[in-house]
UniProtKB/Swiss-Prot annotation:
<feature type="binding site">
    <location>
        <position position="121"/>
    </location>
    <ligand>
        <name>(6S)-5-formyl-5,6,7,8-tetrahydrofolate</name>
    </ligand>
</feature>
<feature type="binding site">
    <location>
        <position position="253"/>
    </location>
    <ligand>
        <name>Mg(2+)</name>
    </ligand>
</feature>
<dbReference type="GO" id="GO:0003924">
    <property type="term" value="F:GTPase activity"/>
</dbReference>
<feature type="domain" description="TrmE-type G">
    <location>
        <begin position="218"/>
        <end position="384"/>
    </location>
</feature>
<dbReference type="InterPro" id="IPR005225">
    <property type="entry name" value="Small_GTP-bd"/>
</dbReference>
<feature type="binding site">
    <location>
        <position position="232"/>
    </location>
    <ligand>
        <name>Mg(2+)</name>
    </ligand>
</feature>
<dbReference type="InterPro" id="IPR027417">
    <property type="entry name" value="P-loop_NTPase"/>
</dbReference>
<comment type="subunit">
    <text>Homodimer. Heterotetramer of two MnmE and two MnmG subunits.</text>
</comment>
<keyword id="KW-0479">Metal-binding</keyword>
<feature type="binding site">
    <location>
        <position position="24"/>
    </location>
    <ligand>
        <name>(6S)-5-formyl-5,6,7,8-tetrahydrofolate</name>
    </ligand>
</feature>
<dbReference type="GO" id="GO:0005525">
    <property type="term" value="F:GTP binding"/>
</dbReference>
<dbReference type="GO" id="GO:0030488">
    <property type="term" value="P:tRNA methylation"/>
</dbReference>
<dbReference type="InterPro" id="IPR018948">
    <property type="entry name" value="GTP-bd_TrmE_N"/>
</dbReference>
<feature type="binding site">
    <location>
        <position position="81"/>
    </location>
    <ligand>
        <name>(6S)-5-formyl-5,6,7,8-tetrahydrofolate</name>
    </ligand>
</feature>
<dbReference type="GO" id="GO:0046872">
    <property type="term" value="F:metal ion binding"/>
</dbReference>
<feature type="binding site">
    <location>
        <begin position="247"/>
        <end position="253"/>
    </location>
    <ligand>
        <name>GTP</name>
    </ligand>
</feature>
<feature type="binding site">
    <location>
        <begin position="272"/>
        <end position="275"/>
    </location>
    <ligand>
        <name>GTP</name>
    </ligand>
</feature>
Length: 460
């Protein structure tokens, strides 16, 4: 029997032990399994309290079950759910009983969702939205994932593809009736109007998107600078826990340390890098090389150190914010006019260096926390601006979406080339429809399905 024809089961709830656990069963034998273990099949979509017994009539649990007949279920197949007490022994006994049935096996990661996709319960963009929702760590990620799961992009792509196919049908009909007077022109005209409208809509979506697909990975902020300026102390302060070793000895941090933060609902990856300086220690040299490479890849760099060293040490096009640390060590006489957060002090320091307008500047004490709140607030504002298109207007949530929409847009634009033969217009439209079909997971996507569904947990 083909694996897709087998009935699958898995724990669909969280880690045990817990108050309750949910075991989901999907497939042709779900009905038989439920009836055999509970003694009767409950009405569809009805909660029933039952006694679950194994094939030897040994009591497993006093539990609740639900029954969903195909196709009105999450997977489009017959589905049974066992809501049992969340003890490990209870689950083990139920799993043993389920595995005793022929053609019933444990599910692979993401197999329930893949069956839902294959049975037309959701398209590939919605499946990706579900994956993003499961892995969402921040409010902004959750909002975008919920909209994608609800068909934000999928509904548009289906409509666009259907209209392209309609236009293609008109053009092909015109080709068939090319010898019938002006029939071809009469059929081509409305098709080209439709194509122009669709091209405009897709181009508008692509133009409106900023970096919304980056929400899945988050903004990358590198903390860079020479040794012993407080980089590790700052990342510990921002992480609110000890993630980096703090030592008075220069060169303590040898490797890149990463911390995930939620700033204003946006995901931010904070990177503590090795102190950038000349060194004859081969290990420290490698740390400095990695620090420079990571800073060059960052979306924002927080530079702790002398301003004149920034352009030499930091490569790449990311904006650089100058952070003057250890303001608690500055004599009181030098801090007159500084506000409680240290921003005023930062401005004074910048003015003495004659570079006040060059970059954002902050004066902080990573050790005491002075000024850190102002800097965090500014970082949250930077993240919000960076992900500006990830609000309610965002449609694209993955790079795959963008690439396929770009392909469709190019094909539609080519199809509108003045003087292009109808046969070539039809071919461009076929390619555009194919790109949208791959976006939805309806054509030629077998190579990406395993990667997408393999990210899901078992039981989803």
């Amino acid at each position: 029997m083909h694996p897709n024809d087998q009935t699958i089961f898995a724990l669909a709830s969280g880690r045990l032990p817990s108050a309750l656990a949910i075991v989901r069963v999907s497939g042709a034998r779900a009905r038989d399994v439920l009836a055999a273990l509970t003694g009767a099949l409950p009405p569809p979509r009805t909660v029933r309290r039952v006694r679950i017994r194994d094939v030897n009539h040994e009591l497993i649990d006093d539990a609740v079950v639900l029954w969903f007949a195909a196709p009105a279920s999450a997977t489009g197949e017959d589905v049974a759910e066992f809501h049992i007490h969340g003890g490990r022994a209870v689950l083990a006994a139920l799993v043993k009983a389920l595995a005793s049935f022929d053609d019933v096996r444990p599910a692979e990661p993401g197999e329930f969702t893949r069956r839902a996709f294959e049975n037309g319960k959701l398209d590939l963009t919605e499946a990706e939205g579900l994956d993003d929702l499961i892995h969402a760590d921040t409010e902004a990620q959750r909002r975008l994932a919920v909209r994608q799961l609800g068909g934000l992009l999928g509904d548009r792509a289906r409509r666009w593809r259907a209209q392209i196919i309609e236009a293609l049908a008109l053009i092909e009909a015109g080709i068939d009736f090319a010898d019938e007077g002006d029939v071809q022109g009469e059929l081509m005209a409305p098709a080209l109007r439709t194509i122009a409208t669709l091209h405009g809509e897709i181009a508008e979506v692509l133009a409106a998107q900023g970096k919304s697909e980056r929400l899945r990975d988050g903004l990358v902020v590198a903390i860079a600078g020479p040794p012993n300026v407080g980089k590790s102390t700052l990342i510990n302060r921002l992480a609110r826990r000890e993630v980096a070793i703090v030592s008075p000895h220069a060169g303590t941090t040898r490797d890149v340390i990463e911390v995930q933060l939620d700033l204003g609902g946006y995901p931010v990856t904070l990177i503590d890098t090795a102190g950038i300086r000349e060194s004859e220690d081969s290990v420290e040299q490698e740390g400095v090389r990695r620090a420079k490479a990571r800073a060059a890849e960052a979306d924002l760099v927080l530079w702790l150190g002398a301003d004149e060293a920034i352009d030499v040490a930091v490569e790449g096009s990311a904006p650089v914010w100058r952070v003057r640390n250890k303001i608690d060590l500055v004599p009181q006489a030098d801090t007159v006019g500084a506000d409680s957060g240290g921003a005023g002090l930062a401005a004074n320091l910048w003015q003495t260096e004659g570079n006040v307008a060059a970059r954002e500047a902050f004066g902080i004490s990573a050790k005491r926390g002075d000024g850190v709140g102002d800097m965090v607030e500014a970082l949250a504002g930077f993240a919000a601006q960076y992900f500006a298109a990830s609000g309610e207007a965002a449609v694209i949530s993955r790079e795959r979406h963008r690439l396929l929409l770009q392909q469709a847009e190019v094909m539609l634009r080519c199809s509108m080339t003045v003087g292009l033969a109808p046969e070539l217009v039809a071919e461009e439209l076929r390619l555009a429809a194919g790109a949208l079909g791959r976006l939805l997971g309806r054509v030629d996507v077998e190579d990406v399905l395993g990667e997408i569904f393999g990210r899901f947990c078992i039981g989803k």
